[in-house]
């Protein structure tokens, strides 16, 4: 008998895509699935759609709750999930038929607490899937660094052992970077992780993209998570060079986001980001980064307008 996999789907204002999402999960080639639909107080037809799916398929369980955001909905799902492994899907998205068979196979064959895959982005329709190369990490520092860097922080591209998650939950105070923080905390309990570069998840980019919906709170949240990770004991264990590289990588990403969205026009916000970049600069220049990245960091720190004006025109 396959190990039970609980898949948690937060549902809010997703009536356009919800049926597609649910159908893609229930038609998985992996045989032992529990689907937890968490209606996060959705004001549209989603609550009734969730109940309808539960009546049609015994594998579907439904939670109705007051609206409090995706993190709260995921946490409610985690509290109900009874599987030995857990996955997450966003209600606007869908998955390939063999996604969970592939992830669970990689997890079980490698005794991995986390198993991930690549994904398609609807804003980049010409992407093709990779050949399915599998990378297995078993060194603790490598696993923590993988999560700490923030480059692979989407929880919907992975399955996790319930044992590794334990009592860890999503931080409901964050409006962004909650996936990143969750992955980092779980990574402390991961002995082995396995990743395939095969794209098995379909991410639906909203017309009003994240960039256009950014605000200072979201970027400050990301920086707060960065500071927490770099300041934590596990973050410090990565070494000064690794930590300096991660810190500057995220700060420059935040700077670019703020430029594209125009948030950096707020003087206090720009001062705060520049202050943090300058504070991180000395360590970054000595961490072995490429000359191109070092020059870019210096421009951000001391000549912000040289970069911000062209960025806004893109």
Walk through the language-model features, giving the residues of each:
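A conserved acidic beta->alpha catalytic loop
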Residues: 24, 31, 39-48, 68, ...
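Catalytic core of nucleotide-sugar-dependent glycosyltransferases
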Residues: 191, 199-206, 212-238, 252-280
